[in-house]
Amino acid sequence: MAKFLEQQKYEERIGKTLISAEEIQNKIAEVGKIIDNLYDGRPILLLSILKGSFVFMADLCRAISVPCEIAFMCAKSYFSGTESTGNVNIVMDIDRDISKYHVIIVEDIIDTGRTLKHIYNMIKDRNPLSLRVVTLLDKKERRVVEFDADIALFPIPDYFVIGYGLDCGEKYRNLPYIAEFRQDI
């Protein structure tokens, strides 16, 4: 019975769908073509910020037809809650020289902007050939530092969102769409 109630609560916390799986895939296909045109024949390194962007990264790299390499960083500013701590902790850094690449940081969501600005500045200091940011979701009304992505697929209102790699307490990452997380349950 306890497992049933836990599953029921899990499902009840999935709020309204904000962006469908089909909308996500269509937009990623568009962005893949943009990246193809921007970097034709030049060395690209897609840098995924874990954990949230891993699903987006997988789909985006398949939508790009020009050769690209991938790398990962893990940064945390949320520690099993719904509010950012305000501190950026680099849990895993990239393991290569990026000075011979055009680096595209692939992010799941820009919220306050603190985490991404911190990572952007770290990467910029390592002298890539160029540096751009692509984010799946952009929550501008929560921004506390000035930072904009070069490409933002979807602007979203100030909801805590789950799905398509985004989580709450490590759950809901496997949803194929973006939904509002119901905190009131």
Residue ranges and their predicted role:
Residues 1-185:
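PRPP-associated nucleotide enzymes
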